[in-house]
Swiss-Prot record:
Pathway given in the UniProt record: Amino-acid degradation; L-arginine degradation via AST pathway; L-glutamate and succinate from L-arginine: step 4/5
Binding site for NAD(+): 221-226
Keyword annotations from UniProtKB, A to Z: Arginine metabolism, NAD, Oxidoreductase
Keyword hit for Lyase: no
CDD domains to which the protein is assigned, alphabetical: ALDH_SGSD_AstD (cd07095)
Name of this chain's protein: N-succinylglutamate 5-semialdehyde dehydrogenase
GO annotation (BP), single: arginine catabolic process to glutamate
Recorded family membership: Belongs to the aldehyde dehydrogenase family. AstD subfamily.
PANTHER family, per the entry: ALDEHYDE DEHYDROGENASE-RELATED
Pfam families from the UniProt entry: Aldedh
Lineage: Bacteria, Pseudomonadati, Pseudomonadota, Gammaproteobacteria, Pseudomonadales
Record-listed E.C. numbers: 1.2.1.71
Amino acid sequence: MSTLYIAGAWQAGQGELFHSLNPVTLHVLWSGQGATAEQVDHAVQAARQAFPAWALLSLDQRIAVLDAFAVSLKAHADELANCIGEETGKPLWESATEVTSMVNKIAISVQSYRERTGEKSAPLGDATAVLRHKPHGVVAVFGPYNFPGHLPNGHIVPALLAGNTVLFKPSELTPKVAELTVKCWIEAGLPAGVLNLLQGGRETGIALAANPGIDGLFFTGSSRTGNALHQQFAGRPDKILALEMGGNNPLVVDQVQDIDAAVYTIIQSAFISAGQRCTCARRLLVPEGDWGDALLARLVAVSATLDVGAFDQQPAPFMGSVISLEAARALLDAQRHLLANGAVTLLEMRQPQPGAALLTPGIVDVSAVANRPDVELFGPLLQVVRYAGFDAAIAEANATQYGLAAGLLSDSEARYQQFWLQSRAGIVNWNKQLTGAASSAPFGGVGASGNHRASAYYAADYCAYPVASLETGSLTLPATLTPGVRLS
C-alpha cells in the first residue's frame, strides 16, 4: 500500500507495519508501513530540491496555491469530518468545526504574515531602512492526534506561505486524516517536493528529527516528546525549534452569582473533546464552604448526565471517546492512583462499554492528596482542590511546572486583574472556557508548556527570519568624511 508521499509520488513505506483503529469499534481504518531512515532522507532531499523554486515564487503565487487548498478542503469537508470523527472518536459536530478551522487558517495566516513578517520600510537619512523576511528552508512538522487536521495545518500553512518546504510526520494514531489532507494539497496544485508525507511511529520521528538536512522542526504534542526534541536540538542554534506542549491547567472559581453559568463553563473547559485539548482544565480550584459545596454538587449532577457515545451516534453526544483503548486504561489507572493516595470520588470516571475507549466524565477531590502529581492527565478527569482564600488559590494555580492556560470565573474585575498579573501562563481567560481561543491571538505557554515559540497567529514568527537592510540606489560619498580618512 502506498502510504508515503515523497517528491510528488506515492510510494510504499518500508518500515514497521502499523494500523489506525476506530477507538470505539476497534475496526481497522488504515494500514501501512512507516518510512525508514532511508526514505526519510529521500524526502528531505526532495524538499531541499523543491525549496529554491518554491521560495522564489511571489507571495501572491503562494497564496493562490493556499487558496486552492481551501477550496479543496471545502469540497471534501464531509469526507474529512467523517474521517476525523472515525479516527479520533470525536463527535461529527466537533470534527466538522475542525475542518472549518482548517479552511479559516488560510486567510488568518495570510493576514498574520503581512502583519508580522511582511515587508516594511522607512526613510533613514539618505537611505531607506527595509525589513523583509526569508524562509528557513526545509522544516519538519510533527502533528498530534487530538486535532489531526487543524493543528498540523497551523504549522504547515504558515510554513508554506513563508516559502519553506515541509516534511509532515503525523501521529501514528491518525494516519488516515493526514493522508486525506495531503491529497487536498495535491488537488490544490502544490508542486512536487514542497510537501512530503512521512507516515510512521517513533522510529520515523527519530530519523526525521535527527536528519541533518532539516532547518527546523515544529512540534505539537506531549511534554515528554517535546523535552526529548529540545535536548536533541541542544547546541544547534542554526536550527529553529518550535514546541507547543500541554499543561496542568488551573481553572479558579470565585463565588459567582450564576452557578449554572459556572457549571456550564467548567464542563466546556474540562470535558469537551473528552478532555483531549491542550488547554482543557485539569485542576478546578473551588472555595471552601457552603457555596463551594453547592457548586460542586451542581457540577457533579450535570456532568453525570452528559451524553457520551460513538462519533456518529444520533442524537449527537457531547463527548466521544478518547484516542485509544490504551489511553482509556491509562486514565482509569491514574484515577485509581489518585484514590489510593487520598483523593475522594465526586463522580467516578467509568468505561461504559468494555473493549471501547469511551469514558464518562470523572471528578475527584484531591485536596487531601499530598505531593499531587504535576502531570497532564489527557482525558475527562477533573481534579478539584478546595482553597481558603484568593491568594491561596492563585498560589495553587501557579504550583505547576507547566504554563499553558489558566482561567478565573469571578464577578470581580479587581480579582481578575490580580489573577492576570500573578498568573504564569500564556493564555489567561476571565469568565470564558479555558478551551476557547481567538484566531487573531497567539497560542502557547511558558515553563514545560513550550519554548517561547507561540503558534496560531504568531506562527509566522518562527516560519521566517528577519533580514534588515539599508538601501540606496546610488553609491556616493558622504558630505563629510569620517575623521582620519583622506581620499586625496
